[in-house]
């Protein structure tokens, strides 16, 4: 179950000068955890993220036979395949509910999946249909959590066509395990626009980094050859999506923040924050691996297609609510199936503080408004919670109703936030 709710009176700030060291990427950590559990030899993950989502992933993979051991800030992983029935808690982690079922099918036993109440509303039809098409037995009352995978220790693989328009995680979840399928996998997407393509590129990069033959064969098609997944020592990059609130804080307050170990090349969509916040008024530079962002006193609106980087939307929307010109954030219809319906939630919360936001078919329109304090609801969504904290830097009296939900990807968010602001 999720952490106990904790309300948070968001502190205001007139600017600051700080360096913020980010923990590891959730997206990379959970992909490397899956590959390490399926590998032919042990692995070591250097600086992985330890948060609710990654703990849920570790617990799930342990129940399927892998072993994990802490070594300082690193994590040692010994692969293994389970042969017992098990119950897996997905929490609200899309990566767990969509990446682990194929792994469960490669184990032997009846593996039950469930999660938080909100997780039962998240799209899962494609995962269940995919497994059934691959010959895996799945038990369910409806094609959503809870369900059970009956693993036989093998998946034939072959050709598979799916509709992944609700989430790129449906593609990544299959690709990550596909090298262990008897015939590998030829996967194609047939449906509406595929969101968050950089996340699929990240999945392919992690696979090839483990010696797997994995490639994109057409605009919406991928191929993974059968074979071993190598053990490896993998450095986990800082989580650039989690950089968003800290970068936004500098922009909206006129402060300066430095983020060390910012990669010059990455598959993380959070790298787009440097460009997007530059367009919204910040001065941004990257020198010797440190990204520096300074607010200029100007906050511009933005018209942007975020289809490839939808998870950045709550942060960009929070900045847009404080901007002096209108914004349009489009290409993000798939956010309706995230931790909550992020489009409806952002519109409701911005408007509740006196802002002017409207839902579009595939996004949000935000105009300058006269904001005031009030309760900002987080909807058990970590990025909604941090969006409220951003607005609270400028608007006095904002109370985030549940800051504890940030533990999903950033366990010490409040400590990092207040240290950045000079309050600790």
PLM feature spans:
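Short, structured segments at the rim of ligand-binding sites
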Residues: 1-424
């Amino acid at each position: 179950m999720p952490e106990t709710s904790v309300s948070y009176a968001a502190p205001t700030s007139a600017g600051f000068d700080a360096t913020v060291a980010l923990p590891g990427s959730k997206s990379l950590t959970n992909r490397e955890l899956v590959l390490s559990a399926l590998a032919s030899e042990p692995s070591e993950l250097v600086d992985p993220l330890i948060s609710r989502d990654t703990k849920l992933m570790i617990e799930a993979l342990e129940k399927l036979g892998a072993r994990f051991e802490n070594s300082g800030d690193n994590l040692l992983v010994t692969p293994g395949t389970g042969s017992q029935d098990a119950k897996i808690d997905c929490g609200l982690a899309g990566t767990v509910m969509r990446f682990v079922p194929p792994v469960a099918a490669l184990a032997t036993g009846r593996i039950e999946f469930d999660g938080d109440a909100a997780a039962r509303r998240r799209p899962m039809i494609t995962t269940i249909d995919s497994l059934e098409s691959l010959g895996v037995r799945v038990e369910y009352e409806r094609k959503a959590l809870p369900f059970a995978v009956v693993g036989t220790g093998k998946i034939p693989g072959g050709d598979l066509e799916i509709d992944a328009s609700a989430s790129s995680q449906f593609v990544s979840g299959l690709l990550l395990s596909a090298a262990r399928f008897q015939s590998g996998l030829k996967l194609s997407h047939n449906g509406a626009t595929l969101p968050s393509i950089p996340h699929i590129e990240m999945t392919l990069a992690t696979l090839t980094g483990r010696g797997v033959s994995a490639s994109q064969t057409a605009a919406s098609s991928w191929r993974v050859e059968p074979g071993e997944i190598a053990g490896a020592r993998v450095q986990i990059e800082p989580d650039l999506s989690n950089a968003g609130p800290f970068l936004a804080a500098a922009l909206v307050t006129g402060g300066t923040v430095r983020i060390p170990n910012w990669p010059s090349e990455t598959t993380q969509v959070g790298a787009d924050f440097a460009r997007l916040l530059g367009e919204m008024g910040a001065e941004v530079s990257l020198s010797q691996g440190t990204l520096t962002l300074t607010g200029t006193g100007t906050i511009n609106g933005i018209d942007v297609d975020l289809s490839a980087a939808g998870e950045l939307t709550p942060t960009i929307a929070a900045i847009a609510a404080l901007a002096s010109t209108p914004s349009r954030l489009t290409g993000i219809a798939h956010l309706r199936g995230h931790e909550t319906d992020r489009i409806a939630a952002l519109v409701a919360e911005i408007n509740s503080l006196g802002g002017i936001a409207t839902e579009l078919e595939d996004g949000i329109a935000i105009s300058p408004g006269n904001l005031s304090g009030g309760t900002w609801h987080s909807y058990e969504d970590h990025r909604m919670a941090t969006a409220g904290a951003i607005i609270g830097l400028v608007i006095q009296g904002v109370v985030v109703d549940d800051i504890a939900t940030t533990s999903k990807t950033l366990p010490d968010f409040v400590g990092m936030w207040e240290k950045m602001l000079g309050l600790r």
